[in-house]
């Protein structure tokens, strides 16, 4: 997403004066139908700018399940949830890099603390 960003780092746009649409919810409705729109969508990728409507990225959730998942993943080394810039700072940096044609991975990594940047994983998915 390279447009406006909410205080929580989600893409957004205005469709009328005073009427804001959260971009990932709009994309999800386009992909899955407005009738199938859940009250809450969870970002499995922990990237609030993500616009990918596939279940690997966005899925229906409850407030309780979304909060529990956030709490369990915020301590994962290298997680976007650990970015020292906060969700808005991280989203703004990534959006600006995308607008400027800059590689996104170094920009994403720049917000991680020393522990996150230097910690090797204990195991990989293939093990």
Model-predicted segments: where are they?
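Short, cationic Gly/His-enriched loop motifs
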Residues: 18-127
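Long, compositionally biased stretches
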Residues: 1-19, 48
């Amino acid at each position: 997403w390279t447009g406006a960003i909410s205080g929580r780092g989600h893409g957004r746009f205005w469709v009328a004066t005073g009427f804001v649409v959260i971009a990932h919810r709009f994309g999800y409705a386009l992909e899955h139908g407005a009738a199938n729109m859940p009250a809450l969508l969870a970002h499995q990728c922990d990237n609030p700018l993500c616009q990918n409507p596939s279940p690997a990225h966005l899925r229906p959730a409850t407030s309780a399940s979304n909060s529990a998942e956030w709490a369990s993943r915020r301590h994962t080394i290298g997680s976007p949830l650990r970015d020292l810039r906060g969700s808005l700072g991280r989203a703004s940096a990534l959006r600006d890099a995308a607008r400027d044609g800059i590689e996104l991975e170094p920009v994403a990594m720049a917000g991680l603390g020393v522990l996150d940047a230097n910690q090797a994983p204990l195991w990989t998915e293939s093990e």
